[in-house]
Amino acid sequence: MNDLLRILREQITSFPLILRLAAYETKSKYQMNYLGVLWQFLNPLIQMLAYWFVFGMGIRKGGPVTTGAGEVPFIIWMLAGLIPWFFISPTILDGSNSVFKRINMVAKMNFPISSLPSVAIASNLFSYMIMMVIYIIVLLVNGVFPSVHWLQYIYYFICMIAFMFSFSLFNSTISVLIRDYQFLLQAVTRLLFFLLPIFWDVNAKLGQSHPELVPVLKLNPLFYIIEGFRNSFLDGAWFFHDMKYTLYFWLFTFLLLLVGSILHMKFRDKFVDFL
């Protein structure tokens, strides 16, 4: 428990430097390109249009989706899950590689290594925030107006950040110790894309044909986050309506953070030896 508290204190005390490093990393990543940081938004935008064309216009033939807010265009329903995924997916990979990638740099600085996963999270947040603003505009244009349920977006955002930090702290340590783990994580991330309720309503599609699979898919904490964002904007369901699932998510996140903190503190002084 002491390791966990120390890790959290390091995030708080290093917060200003985390933001500066994240901003620097974002700029340096695109500085050699003509369009610069604009690619941070163009790339997911192109993917959004491709997915909408294939799944919305192709498979669904342009049909609307029925939600708690009434019938809405498929693209609105899709983006509610896809935009969080565009943050989650690169953060999983960047966070897992954050210590291995920057250990030599921070070894010369008065900067806690445990904050490196936070830098990866913060750098991906810039484009995520822009995409969320665009999404809200799209909602308003299509007649989906703010309701009291929108307030719980803040709650699910906190859930997402808490889980991503816990997951990244754990993964960043394992990735240094076992380099093959990074390749495994890439494969799992690609698989998760199709197992999450991004393009399909799991409860509706599997609820009747294979109801036993629904609880299994919901064991994934990312399922809770993706479904929560959609509930906030479209379905009008409160997170406390399913307290067992909420408690499961936070217990899973806490245990992951605890294990990640213990492993990180145990090996942090030996990270350089594994490079």
Swiss-Prot record:
**Gene Ontology molecular function:** ABC-type transporter activity
Is Cell membrane one of the keywords UniProt gives this record?
yes
Keyword terms: Cell membrane, Membrane, Transmembrane, Transmembrane helix, Transport
Q: Which domain of life is it from?
A: Bacteria
The protein's matches in PANTHER family, at most eight in alphabetical order, are given as:
CAPSULE POLYSACCHARIDE EXPORT INNER-MEMBRANE PROTEIN CTRC, INNER MEMBRANE TRANSPORT PERMEASE
Q: What do we know about how this protein assembles, alone or with others? A: The complex is composed of two ATP-binding proteins (TagH) and two transmembrane proteins (TagG).
| Protein name as it appears in the record | Teichoic acid translocation permease protein TagG
User: Its gene?
Assistant: tagG
